[in-house]
Amino acid sequence: MPGKKAPNGEFAGRKLKLKRKKFRWSDIRYKRRVLRLKEKSDPLEGAPQARGIVLEKIAVEAKQPNSGMRKAVRVQLIKNGKVVTAFCPGDGAIKFIDEHDEVIIEGIGGPKGGSMGDIPGIRYKVVKVNRVSLKELVKGRKEKPRR
């Protein structure tokens, strides 16, 4: 008669726990969390926001069934030099952003840290331009500082 796989005594708790630990590595979510793979591959390095310099303005075509050009900017992050694309939310918001401006970007809020709605492949959005809120600039409450 073959031996049993798991101990089942009064003091077998530690052994059962160690045995369970081995199998957790086959769970992808556990593995990614423990090895901190998201932070390692994330351009923001796990931070909620990041500062960067605008390299160029671009227009991205919306996904089907929508049509239109979504205005975005290519931003080089100051902390690690990585280049990411960030969406400019708001009507005419792109007009307040020029090349070589300093912007603050954050996640766009899509599912699982991905892109949002009909904007393909863009995971970040611009929040501030030269330390002034982009929302305030678009609404006309504040003016962009002249350098």
UniProtKB/Swiss-Prot annotation:
GO molecular function ontology, one term from the record: rRNA binding
Protein name: Small ribosomal subunit protein uS12
GO cellular component, one term: small ribosomal subunit
Function: With S4 and S5 plays an important role in translational accuracy. Located at the interface of the 30S and 50S subunits.
Superkingdom, taxonomy of origin: Archaea
Species name: Pyrococcus abyssi (strain GE5 / Orsay)
Family classification: Belongs to the universal ribosomal protein uS12 family.
GO terms under biological process: translation
Pfam families on file: Ribosom_S12_S23
